[in-house]
Amino acid sequence: RFTSEEVIWLTLEFYRRNYIEGLFLSSGIIRSSDHTMEEMVRIARELRTIHNFRGYIHLKSIPEASAHLIEEAGLYADRLSINIELPTDAGIGQFAPEKRPDNIRQSMGNLRLKIEEMAEPTMQTKRRKKFAPAGQSTQMIVGADGANDATILGTSARLYGSYGLKRVYYSAFSPIPDSSRNLPLIKPPLMREHRLY
């Protein structure tokens, strides 16, 4: 695991050398949702305000984190994402019972409202502060549950319509040794991921 300082240093060094054009920042939960989100916001804030970083920042938000932290993240990140995880609520309940689909959708809805609110001009200015100017996206794992392509595409269509997403990403399920017995042992063909796009 990298420290926040290491992530900042690596990002700046790779950016200066033209190895990268930006940063995709994601993390598993460390201590708590808020602690993890605070660290990710700190990285984005320091890159922008202290180091004048002009590259792209995509920050993967944690739905259980406090709303003010997700709002602060949007001031420094070009795009925010909240992962839907799986195409159906039943799949989430079966394979990720610690996740709450309603919380995920509520966070996505709140983020959409904030993006729209910050895009509206005010009486004092023609534009407000930038807030996640590249919008929000999500990702779902395909092939872990029994959802067929029609179900996955239906879920994607609802997500685009309901939350104003800029992109739904698909990631083919990859089995992990010694994981839950509920998960399939065989990886779905990569062609399925490509077909969904």
Predicted regions and their residues:
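Conserved Radical SAM active-site core
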Residues: R1-T138, A144-G146, L159, N182
